[in-house]
Amino acid sequence: MIRKILFFTFIFLTAISSRASFILLPMDETSQQNHLKAYGITYWCLNKNYKASWLLNYRGGSFLLPDAAEIRKECQIRGVSFEVLSDSEETTILNEISSPSQNMESVVLEKAPKIAVYTPKGKQPWDDAVTLVLTYAEIPFTPIYDEEVLADQLLLYDWLHLHH
């Protein structure tokens, strides 16, 4: 009887410790089927007050998100590849990234930035590579031009994209 209790306790504890807690959006060329939309998913999560980690130089700059049904569903809707990770898998990845022998870093993202793109009025998204990419990725942005700059409206944005 004691053996059965110990066995089921072991199985239960193993199941709890290996439960899914994170979603990895891989960004390497072989694992991600829609890179641009993956950026959009990350922005969407930040906009919904989830925190994300950008795993620089890990599998193409992957994103680590909390596991939530609505995130999984949104990934499926947008055609974004994702992997479900347990706590122990997440710890292994973060330990690898933090190793002094690796050129990697984990950057915590906490807030969706308000984005402005410096572009003339009346342009269609496909007229400009940046607006095309942001539109396709479903990342909201505001087109601004000289009038807004002269009216001191740059202060309203966290990120300004200028063409070079």
Show the residue positions of the predicted features.
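N-terminal, post-signal-peptide region of Sec/Tat-exported proteins
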Residues: 35-74
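Short amphipathic alpha-helices in soluble, non-transmembrane regions
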Residues: 71-84
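Non-catalytic propeptide/linker segments at domain boundaries
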Residues: 81-111
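Histidine/cysteine-enriched polar flanking segments
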Residues: 37, 88-97, 153-163
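Boundary at the C-terminal end of the N-terminal hydrophobic targeting segment
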Residues: 18-20
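Sec-dependent N-terminal signal peptides
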Residues: 2-16
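Helical hinge/lid and interdomain linker segments adjacent to catalytic or ligand-binding clefts
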Residues: 23, 27-33, 64-73, 116-164
